[in-house]
């Protein structure tokens, strides 16, 4: 009887941990905090300030290169 109880608890633990992993993966995909980084392509004007979007390359003479 004790062996069946230990086996039952082990199965519940495995099922619970796999469900936790699945839900953790789903949470990270649905999270609004994880956003795709945006950048300006070459030729666009570099914008300074708090709401600026960085260049994909570098900013030279107010143009993205």
From Swiss-Prot:
Q: Per the entry's comment, what about the domains?
A: The presence of a 'disulfide through disulfide knot' structurally defines this protein as a knottin.
What is the protein name for this chain?
Answer: U2-theraphotoxin-Pc1a
Main localization is secreted
Task: Give the UniProt keywords, A-Z.
Answer: Cleavage on pair of basic residues, Disulfide bond, Knottin, Secreted, Signal, Toxin
What else the UniProt entry mentions is: Usually endopeptidases cleave the propeptide at the C-terminus of the basic doublet (Arg-37-38-Arg), but here, it seems that the endopeptidase cleaves the precursor within the doublet.
Give the highest taxon in the source lineage.
Answer: Eukaryota
Cited function: Possesses strong antiplasmodial activity against the intra-erythrocyte stage of P.falciparum in vitro. IC(50) for inhibiting P.falciparum growth is 1.15 uM. Specifically interacts with infected erythrocytes. Does not lyse erythrocytes, is not cytotoxic to nucleated mammalian cells, and does not inhibit neuromuscular function. Has neither antibacterial nor antifungal activity.
Gene Ontology molecular function, alphabetical: toxin activity
Record propeptide residues: 21-36
The signal peptide here is 1-20
Q: In which tissues is it expressed?
A: Expressed by the venom gland.
Query: What family name appears in the similarity comment?
Result: Belongs to the neurotoxin 36 family. 02 subfamily.
UniProt keyword Secreted, yes or no: yes
Per UniProt, subcellular location reads as: Secreted
Record-annotated disulphide pairs: 39-56, 46-59, 55-64
The cellular component terms of Gene Ontology attached to this UniProt record, alphabetical and capped at eight, are: extracellular region
């Amino acid at each position: 009887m004790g062996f069946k109880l230990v086996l039952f608890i082990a199965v519940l633990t495995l099922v619970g941990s796999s469900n936790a992993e699945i839900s953790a993966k789903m949470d990270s995909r649905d999270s609004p905090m994880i956003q795709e980084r945006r950048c300006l392509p070459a030729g666009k004007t570099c914008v300074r300030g708090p709401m600026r979007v960085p260049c994909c390359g570098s900013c030279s003479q107010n143009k993205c290169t």
